[in-house]
UniProtKB/Swiss-Prot annotation:
Belongs to the TatC family. It is a multi-pass membrane protein. This is Uncharacterized tatC-like protein ycf43. It is found in: Plastid, Chloroplast membrane. PANTHER family: SEC-INDEPENDENT PROTEIN TRANSLOCASE PROTEIN TATC, SEC-INDEPENDENT PROTEIN TRANSLOCASE PROTEIN TATC, CHLOROPLASTIC-RELATED. Keywords: Chloroplast, Membrane, Plastid, Transmembrane, Transmembrane helix. GO terms for molecular function: proton motive force dependent protein transmembrane transporter activity. InterPro entries: Sec-indep_translocase_CS (IPR019820), TatC (IPR002033). The lineage of its organism: Eukaryota, Rhodophyta, Florideophyceae, Rhodymeniophycidae, Gracilariales. Its main location: plastid.
């Protein structure tokens, strides 16, 4: 249903359902197409994901492991790359039911959230993953030769990338809490001691490796994100 967004337009329940059906269809189609493209270029994606572990031998420990892992990576990659388009379809569906004031609040939040999510993935790929792999490879390298399972390696990488992307949503959560007047920037600042402890715990939970280097870097990143959220709320006078 192609139409211009009108905040004063009232739709019947059947029109809402038809609109929802079309948005879901478009979002699903985009996801399927992008996932298929990712699977077609799986060698290129695998090469990119293997870069932090140059020099490591990867083994296929079970029949079909590479195939099943390739499908998993293609699904994750498809979801990642199609997520902005899916969110756009969701936005088009909910905007007509919002007031102008609500739309001016939600749209920037969604846009910044996408940017932060991808920033978290880039941060993990450039900083966290190399730091974690370097520690794990060097630890005991004189005793054992690092030969890794292809599937387990990609599970490790994908979990770290996506968990970091989610962790980068902290400023968004803070801004929402501030705008809704649940917590003010002053109250968030007053709890900084608990946040230091919480950042350490969160870093330990979301990082798949147990090495201290990765957890320290992640803790610092979480604290920096939390501080940026407070600064943003200060600017907004919340």
């Amino acid at each position: 249903m192609n139409r211009n967004i009108n905040f004063n337009t009232e739709m019947s329940i059947f029109e809402h359902l038809e609109e929802l059906r079309q948005r879901i269809f478009i979002a699903a189609l985009i996801f399927i197409v992008i996932t298929a493209i990712c699977f077609t270029y799986m060698k290129n994606i695998s090469y990119i994901l293997q870069q932090p572990a140059i020099g490591i031998k990867f083994l296929q420990l079970a029949p079909g492991e590479y195939l099943f892992t390739s499908i998993k990576v293609a699904l994750y990659s498809g979801f990642l790359l199609s997520s902005p388009f899916i969110i756009y379809q969701i936005t088009l569906f909910i905007l007509p039911g919002l007031t102008k004031k609500e739309s001016n609040f939600i749209v920037p939040i969604l846009f910044i959230s996408i940017i932060l999510f991808f920033s978290g993935i880039v941060f993990a790929y450039i900083i966290l993953v190399p730091a974690a792999l370097k520690f794990l490879i060097n630890y005991g390298n004189e005793i054992v030769e690092p030969i890794w399972s292809f599937e387990q390696y990609f599970n490790f990488i994908l979990l770290l990338l996506f968990s970091t992307g989610i962790a980068f949503q902290i400023p968004i959560i803070q801004v929402i809490l501030g705008i809704l007047k649940i917590f003010s920037s002053s109250e968030m600042y007053a709890y900084w001691k608990y946040i230091v402890l919480g950042a350490t715990v969160i870093a330990a939970i979301i990082t798949p490796s147990t090495d201290p280097i990765t957890q320290i870097i992640m803790s610092i990143a979480i604290l920096a994100l939390y501080s940026s959220g407070i600064i943003i709320l200060k600017i907004l006078n919340k």
